[in-house]
Structure formats: C-alpha cells, structure tokens
Amino acid sequence: MIEYLKGAIVGLTPTNLVIECAGVGYDVNVSLTTYSAYQGKKEGLIWITQLIREDAHLLYGFSTKEERTLFGQLTSVSGVGPTTARLILSSYAPQELAALITTGQADALKAVKGIGLKTAQRIIVDLKGKIQLETSSDEILSARTAVGDAALNTIASGEEAISALKMLGFADPAIRKAVKSILSEDSSLAVEDIIKRALRML
C-alpha cells in the first residue's frame, strides 16, 4: 500500500491533485482542506489512503496524518463511504469536525449531503471516544452554537466552485443558485469558502 507520495504538483482543483513522482503522475482525490494546503505550491508530500476495488484503484490524499486518520475513522462508520467522508472533510476542517463529534452536534453533520440524522448520530456514537485531535474550548463553544466559517481569502472563483460542486455530484441549477446567493453576500470569498458554504446549502 502507498503511505505517501512526494513530488511535483502538476495539477490542482478543489477535488483532485495530480502529483508526479519518478515520472509517473498520480491523480489523487482531495478534500477542500487539503486543496487549500497545497494552493500555490509546486512540490509537496501528500499522505495517501489507497482503496482497491474490482473496477478501480482510488487514491485519497491528505495534507496531514490527522486528516487521513479522520477519513479512515469516518469510513469505518456504517453508511459512510469515501465520497461522503470527503464531503464531510470538505465541509469542516479536522479540528472543527473533531469539535462537532466531541460535542455531539448531529444537526451540523446532517447538513452534509448524504448524511441523515441516523448516520450523523451513528458517527457521533462510534467516534466520540476515538477522536484524538485536540480541540480548544473556543472550538467547542463554536461547535455548540454554529460552526464558524473558515478564514476568508482574497479572490473568489465562482466558476471553479461550480465546477468542483458538479464533480461532487450536485445538480447545476441548484449549484448556481447557491453560489450566486453566497457571492451576493460576499464577493471576496475564496473558492474553498464558496464551496464550504454551498455544501451547507445544497
């Protein structure tokens, strides 16, 4: 199994990263958190989870071991597959997600596409005692009220956000309506922030 890949980053979108190692290019599925970590970088090391199926060999990559661990923990929960786990990690940063699970915020988890109330509750029951990430009192307080949005970046790309959301399986009309609404409130949002907000609306 592949532990990590290290090399030149030759392609990067909010959902995928292409990394070249020894002349071979690997297409890696990533979350928004990992996408943000590699923006503007020409080289990097990405931690890998490899899923082997009859019809495909899939790579999921993470900027930290902690995010990879969370991905593995999420996919160990009945009803949570790799696509849903990536959506959860795209909606909430690792520390944010750890705070949600620690404080039992099922409604916040339920806001993610593909997560119903029963699955959200199952995630909390199964993982509450397993989460190892440190969560500060401020993060827990934020989770108990409403999870704070990620820090805003400078320039947003609505079309890139729309394209990424399509790749995640959402319908075009609903995507455009959500993105338009988000940008009408704040046109300076970075693409990952647009997507995070849209994921909570779709």
Swiss-Prot record:
Record GO cellular component, one term: Holliday junction helicase complex
Entry function: The RuvA-RuvB-RuvC complex processes Holliday junction (HJ) DNA during genetic recombination and DNA repair, while the RuvA-RuvB complex plays an important role in the rescue of blocked DNA replication forks via replication fork reversal (RFR). RuvA specifically binds to HJ cruciform DNA, conferring on it an open structure. The RuvB hexamer acts as an ATP-dependent pump, pulling dsDNA into and through the RuvAB complex. HJ branch migration allows RuvC to scan DNA until it finds its consensus sequence, where it cleaves and resolves the cruciform DNA.
Keyword annotations: Cytoplasm, DNA damage, DNA recombination, DNA repair, DNA-binding
Notes on the domains: Has three domains with a flexible linker between the domains II and III and assumes an 'L' shape. Domain III is highly mobile and contacts RuvB.
GO MF annotation: an example: ATP binding
Stretches the record annotates as Domain III: 153-202
Primary localisation category: cytoplasm
Organism domain of life: Bacteria
Keyword Lipoprotein: no
Similarity comment: Belongs to the RuvA family.
Subunit structure: Homotetramer. Forms an RuvA(8)-RuvB(12)-Holliday junction (HJ) complex. HJ DNA is sandwiched between 2 RuvA tetramers; dsDNA enters through RuvA and exits via RuvB. An RuvB hexamer assembles on each DNA strand where it exits the tetramer. Each RuvB hexamer is contacted by two RuvA subunits (via domain III) on 2 adjacent RuvB subunits; this complex drives branch migration. In the full resolvosome a probable DNA-RuvA(4)-RuvB(12)-RuvC(2) complex forms which resolves the HJ.
Name by which UniProt lists this protein: Holliday junction branch migration complex subunit RuvA
GO biological process, one term: DNA recombination
Chain positions covered by the region annotation Flexible linker: 143-153
Subcellular location(s) of the protein: Cytoplasm
Stretches the record annotates as Domain I: 1-63
Region (Domain II): 64-142
Keyword Signal: no
